[in-house]
């Protein structure tokens, strides 16, 4: 930094110290300027919080957001273009309904209803994905650009104005000790910065209809999401009502108990005692697997939907390596590692605390 630059920094620091400690008054700008500055400050805070809250609105689970951010960062490091989508709650609920609907089978009215509801929830998850993309592209991204460009530029002008104001006030109070030419230059630079800052704030506030348009797009996207969701749910309601009508009209079946003890030798596994055969209902279990490291056993099949997840089949023994959060584990199977939901497995040997 040049000697002139060092002197200017000293002047600013000295004036700021005088105002903060000694209570000296600096040059006051007009009320119209101060009001514009206040609105810019509020807009800055509003944009920052809107960005945060809008993301929470679309992706409410902080654990999933953290996991998603980690997976997408890993994808960028690896040079992969495809990113991992947020697991919508409707989709997770739909997967649960479909899984148990299939287990109950086609002869279960409740199972068939679960399949209907599960498919509808999956459709709603797809609609929610579309909402996410629409809001991000047409509301969040423009707000981010507003924060990074327009508001940042205004902030730069205001910061420069404050520095020149301090330099001007310092020299103004020392008239006679400082050459008139320096005071004149300080006045000119102060007025120049004020005009730049004032014009940038004025133009921004006059064109705030752009932000209104972006907000309108956000509301339109949310409305479209709710309309489509309503149509899906109304269709599901009709299907379920139809199943209720079918179930109510079908003939009732009578319960017929089956005897446990029979008098006929049915299989070689039956035990005979005093001429009566008893059907053995107990099967010998295989030898238990010896495990000496953290592991779990799969209760159901798990098909990975996102990159980084570990797929497995019912009955697989998975080595546990880490617990991501209360909902997700990390483990290894057949040399592959990845994440999987805790409610799909039963822990056999827990991870060390």
Curated annotation (Swiss-Prot):
Highest level in a region associated with endocytosis of yolk proteins in developing oocytes (at protein level). Highest level in small ovarian follicles. High levels in brain and testis. Lower level in adrenal glands. Residues 1-21 are annotated as: Membrane-binding amphipathic helix. CDD domains: BAR_Endophilin_A3, SH3_Endophilin_A. Residues 18-249 form the BAR domain. It is a peripheral membrane protein. Keywords: Coiled coil, Cytoplasm, Endocytosis, Endosome, Lipid-binding, Membrane, SH3 domain. GO terms for biological process: endocytosis. Residues 291-350 form the SH3 domain. Residues 60-87 are annotated as: Required for dimerization upon membrane association. Disruption phenotype: Hens express reduced levels of SH3GL3 in ovarian follicles prior to uptake of yolk proteins. The keyword Magnesium does not apply. One of its GO terms (cellular component) is glutamatergic synapse. SMART domains: BAR, SH3. Residues 218-254 are annotated as: Interaction with ARC. Residues 180-201 form a coiled coil. Belongs to the endophilin family. An N-terminal amphipathic helix, the BAR domain and a second amphipathic helix inserted into helix 1 of the BAR domain (N-BAR domain) induce membrane curvature and bind curved membranes. Implicated in endocytosis. May recruit other proteins to membranes with high curvature. Implicated in endocytosis of yolk proteins during oogenesis. This is Endophilin-A3. It comes from Gallus gallus.
């Amino acid at each position: 930094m040049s000697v002139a630059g060092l002197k200017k920094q000293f002047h600013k620091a000295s004036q700021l110290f005088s105002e903060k400690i000694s209570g000296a008054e600096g040059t006051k700008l007009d009320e119209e300027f101060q009001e514009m500055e206040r609105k810019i400050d509020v807009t800055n805070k509003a944009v920052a919080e809107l960005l945060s809250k809008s993301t929470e609105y679309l992706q409410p689970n902080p654990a999933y957001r953290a996991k998603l951010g980690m997976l997408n960062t890993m994808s960028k490091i690896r040079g992969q273009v495809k990113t991992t989508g947020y697991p919508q709650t409707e989709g997770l609920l739909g997967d649960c309904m479909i899984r148990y609907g299939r287990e109950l089978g086609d002869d279960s009215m409740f199972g068939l209803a679960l399949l209907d509801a599960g498919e509808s929830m999956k459709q709603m998850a797809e609609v929610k994905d579309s909402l996410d993309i629409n809001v991000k592209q047409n509301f969040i991204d423009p707000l981010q650009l507003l924060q990074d460009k327009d508001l940042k530029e205004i902030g730069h002008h205001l910061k420069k104005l404050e520095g020149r104001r301090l330099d001007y006030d310092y020299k103004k109070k020392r008239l006679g000790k400082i050459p008139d030419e320096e005071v004149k230059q300080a006045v000119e630079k102060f007025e120049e910065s004020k005009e730049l800052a004032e014009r940038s704030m004025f133009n921004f506030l006059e064109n705030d209809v752009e932000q209104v348009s972006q907000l309108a797009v956000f509301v339109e996207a949310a409305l479209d999401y709710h309309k489509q969701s309503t149509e899906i749910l109304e269709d599901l309601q009709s299907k379920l009502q139809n199943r209720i009508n079918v179930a109510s009209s079908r003939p009732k079946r009578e319960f017929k108990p089956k005897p446990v003890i029979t008098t006929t030798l049915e299989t070689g596994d039956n035990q005979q005692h005093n001429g009566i055969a008893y059907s053995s209902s107990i099967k010998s279990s295989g030898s238990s697997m010896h495990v000496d490291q953290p592991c779990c056993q799969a209760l159901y099949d798990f098909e990975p939907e996102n990159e980084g997840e570990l797929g497995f089949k019912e009955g697989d023994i998975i080595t546990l390596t880490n617990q991501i959060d209360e909902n997700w584990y990390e483990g290894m199977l057949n040399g592959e590692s990845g994440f999987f939901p805790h409610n799909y497995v039963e822990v056999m040997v827990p991870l060390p605390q």
